From Swiss-Prot:
CDD domains: LbH_LpxD. It catalyses: a UDP-3-O-[(3R)-3-hydroxyacyl]-alpha-D-glucosamine + a (3R)-hydroxyacyl-[ACP] = a UDP-2-N,3-O-bis[(3R)-3-hydroxyacyl]-alpha-D-glucosamine + holo-[ACP] + H(+). Keywords: Acyltransferase, Lipid A biosynthesis, Lipid biosynthesis, Lipid metabolism, Repeat, Transferase. Belongs to the transferase hexapeptide repeat family. LpxD subfamily. The gene is lpxD1. Catalyzes the N-acylation of UDP-3-O-acylglucosamine using 3-hydroxyacyl-ACP as the acyl donor. Is involved in the biosynthesis of lipid A, a phosphorylated glycolipid that anchors the lipopolysaccharide to the outer membrane of the cell. This is UDP-3-O-acylglucosamine N-acyltransferase 1. One of its GO terms (cellular component) is membrane. Homotrimer. InterPro entries: Hexapep (IPR001451), Hexapep_transf_CS (IPR018357), LpxD (IPR007691), Trimer_LpxA-like_sf (IPR011004), UDP_GlcNAc_AcTrfase_non-rep (IPR020573). It is an enzyme of class 2 (transferase). The active site is at H246 (proton acceptor). GO terms for biological process: lipid A biosynthetic process.
């Protein structure tokens, strides 16, 4: 797969600095330090300029704010854009490998006669489509996917192999579900029996509702609600190995990184970012545009727009003060002991 530099710049509607007179062929995309001839790279930060000096890349996509400085490093062509990261994302789409070809419904797929299958839907071998399931137009369902009774999947979705979608789940349009994720599994609801000798399982009769343009990573589990719905808002992106408990409500445009755990009945606003391995206590509220740091343990509500980190999690500015105080503790103790000694006080 290859494109000319002109084709790429036109695709981005961007101008080129140091534009060569002849045709320049681009055959790959990679990091500046790993690039070879005919590769296109990305330079979007001041500290990356040294990488460009030594890079073997043929050309680069660069942010406008550093383009003049980069142009003086050498005479290689630069595609100048406002946001180099987003521009590279568009070019990655050009070079991306097409999805595995799958046309129509495989003869070994199991589809209940009551299911409603839209136009141009592809269903792979050993997939199971249950009673009264609805699949929207142009959706691709790969091998071994199981979609149970009364579930609804919107249009233009991609469901990778071995995904499980349980009863009554509702999924919007243009969603991507990666292999082995489980949507609508039983919520973790148990109570001690009256005599305290056993544990009683609480039935969960709700469902999961996923908006449109949602991505869900491999091995992520989203539990169904005790009653009502576990809800994932439009445009939210969820990484691999994330646990989302029953009756959780997640807003629009959130990003949840790998190994995060969200306990039952947590409410998360719009635009929230939860970093890897963070844990959130049940029945807490995370306000819109909040940030939760990696490995944070959130034990209480987080106001909108605040950044919290640490265990237990505190506002980042407050936690920084605690960390500074702890680092100074040995020196402080040394001074305190000296004062105590001068006053004949034992510590």
């Amino acid at each position: 797969m290859q494109y000319t530099l002109k084709q790429i710049s036109e695709h981005l509607n961007a101008k080129v600095i140091n534009e060569p007179s002849g045709e320049v062929i681009i055959t790959g995309l990679t990091y500046a330090e790993q690039a070879k001839e005919n590769d296109l790279t990305l330079i979007d930060k001041q500290e990356h300029i040294k990488l460009w000096q030594n890079s073997k890349a043929t050309a680069a996509i660069v942010s406008k704010k550093i383009s003049k400085e980069l142009a003086q490093v050498n005479d290689k062509p630069l595609i100048v854009v406002n946001n180099a990261d987003l521009a590279m994302a568009k070019i990655l789409e050009l070079f991306s490998v097409p999805y595995p070809e799958q046309n129509g419904i495989h003869e070994k797929a199991i589809i209940d006669p009551t299911a409603k299958i839209g136009k141009n839907v592809s269903i792979g071998p050993s997939a199971y489509i249950g009673k009264n399931v609805e699949i929207g137009d142009n959706t691709i369902i790969y091998a071994n996917v199981c979609i149970y009774n009364d579930a609804k999947v919107g249009t233009n979705c991609i469901i990778w192999p071995s995904v499980i979608i349980r009863d009554r789940t509702i999924i919007g349009h243009f969603c991507r579900l990666c292999s082995n994720c489980s949507i609508g599994s039983d919520g973790f609801g148990y109570r001690p029996s009256e005599d305290g000798r056993t544990i009683v399982r609480i039935p969960h009769i709700g469902n999961v509702v996923i908006g449109s343009f949602v991505d869900i990573g491999s091995n992520t589990c989203i539990n169904n609600a005790k009653y009502g719905s576990t809800i994932i808002g439009d445009y939210t992106k969820i990484d691999n190995l994330v646990q989302i408990g029953h009756n959780v409500i997640i807003g629009k445009g959130c990003m949840i990184c790998g190994q995060a755990g969200i306990s039952g009945s947590v409410t998360i606003g719009d635009g929230v970012i939860i970093a890897g391995n963070a844990g959130i206590k049940d029945h807490t509220n995370i306000g819109s545009d909040a940030r939760i740091g990696g490995k944070a343990g959130v034990m209480w509500d987080v106001p909108a727009g605040e950044s919290h980190m640490g265990y237990p999690a505190y506002k980042d500015s407050e936690l920084a003060k605690q960390w500074i105080a702890i680092r100074k503790l040995p020196e402080t103790m040394k001074k305190l002991k000296a004062i105590a000694k001068s006053l004949n006080i034992d510590l």
